Amino acid sequence: MNDTVKKPTGGRGDDPLPAGAALSAVAPHEPVSVVLAGGGTAGHVEPAMAVADALKALDPNVRITSLGTARGLETRLVPERGYDLELITPVPLPRKPTGDLARLPSRVWRAVRETRAVLHAVDADVVIGFGGYVALPAYLAARGVSPRKPRVPVVIHEANASAGLANRVGARTAQRVLSAVADCGLPGAEVVGVPVREAITSLDRAAVRAEARRHFGFADDARVLLVFGGSQGAASLNRAVSGAAAQLAAAGVSVLHAHGPKNTLDLREPQPGDPPYVAVPYLDRMDLAYAAADLVICRSGAMTVAEVSAVGLPAIYVPLPIGNGEQRLNALPVVNAGGGMVVADADLTPELVAREVAGLVGDPPRLAAMTTAAARVGHPDAARRVAQAALDIGRTARRARGATGGRP
């Protein structure tokens, strides 16, 4: 593995081939080459990195390349995890299909050419796509446009309860379509859950709780509320929870609040004897944050719901009030199972926070039941299942290419 970040090549990779050139004969026993297409937000990058780790666990010799753009979180997250990153041109995507693909912006086709060069350069056997503006060029490049140009098999993973444009396009020709939940809008999708990194899926909250609470400065017997709104925080969560600080303190609730690097909290001066209200811009150790908490207030992006349910943490989900309502849909399986509740963003007030949090943390049997229900909804083996599907397809593709002396 290496941590190289490579800039867009404009259609010619580090080992460029002329457009449509055939590859030389392929050795079928060489390591499988996997290209991960998931960039932009943490919701696309983190599942891709979880699958990358699972690929390495299943086959230490596998070759992994991530696709991304210079504007996405992948420029930091992928090298930090030790994987190679190839950058392509960022392209805007409409939220819904708008007609023939030929009418997509010219930048899409530039990104397709760049992606095709990457597939040639790394001798790709399979592409795993996670949706978003990095995945669409990968799906189109993997198809090829003539018998002389490469066709690379594709595995798609859809994390949201309602599939986006890129995955709807890619699913038409993908070899396998995997999803977080049933009825995501992709025909034939197999439910595997959302890939989550092993540090989270293997977390034993009870075993680590004392260490985690010491890490954040809480008493061993504290009742702890965790609050976070994604990598950039959430203003409405910040206002509602910080506004309830006095009532939470009176109820004996300690708070661990990640407010976002660009935000601040308007907190009152603590009174003598108040439980701690720990406010931080960002949480680098989410595993310890989950272990320290009894309850969480958070958004309901697919990755957030997957992690929170994987560790069995009761939650008050506050869906982001934009898009097609997919965040609310993401939360419904765990909520319907009894592992959490949904509060509309417009209804989230300091009074509601104080009332609901005090009621939940003051009712240990209810919290225990919610913990069990949340954990039952989680899919701790999702990353392994996605990785295994890709390896099976990639190995088959490599054997076929070895038998025919190149691309089929």
Curated annotation (Swiss-Prot):
GO MF terms, alphabetically ordered: UDP-N-acetyl-D-glucosamine:N-acetylmuramoyl-L-alanyl-D-glutamyl-meso-2,6-diaminopimelyl-D-alanyl-D-alanine-diphosphoundecaprenol 4-beta-N-acetylglucosaminlytransferase activity; undecaprenyldiphospho-muramoylpentapeptide beta-N-acetylglucosaminyltransferase activity
Region entry Disordered, spans: 1-20
Pfam families in the record: Glyco_tran_28_C, Glyco_transf_28
Binding site for UDP-N-acetyl-alpha-D-glucosamine: T41, A42, G43, N160, R197, S231, Q327
Domain of life of the source: Bacteria
One GO BP: regulation of cell shape
Gene3D superfamilies named in the record: Glycogen Phosphorylase B (3.40.50.2000)
Compartments (UniProt record): Cell membrane
Cystine pairings recorded for this chain: none
Entry-linked CDD domains: GT28_MurG (cd03785)
Bilayer topology: Peripheral membrane protein
Listed pathway(s): Cell wall biogenesis; peptidoglycan biosynthesis
Main localization of the protein described in the UniProt heading: membrane
Job of this protein: Cell wall formation. Catalyzes the transfer of a GlcNAc subunit on undecaprenyl-pyrophosphoryl-MurNAc-pentapeptide (lipid intermediate I) to form undecaprenyl-pyrophosphoryl-MurNAc-(pentapeptide)GlcNAc (lipid intermediate II).
Similarity field: Belongs to the glycosyltransferase 28 family. MurG subfamily.
Classification via PANTHER family: GLYCOSYLTRANSFERASE, UDP-N-ACETYLGLUCOSAMINE--N-ACETYLMURAMYL-(PENTAPEPTIDE) PYROPHOSPHORYL-UNDECAPRENOL N-ACETYLGLUCOSAMINE TRANSFERASE 1
Protein's recorded name: UDP-N-acetylglucosamine--N-acetylmuramyl-(pentapeptide) pyrophosphoryl-undecaprenol N-acetylglucosamine transferase
Species whose genome carries this gene: Mycobacterium avium (strain 104)
Underlying gene: murG
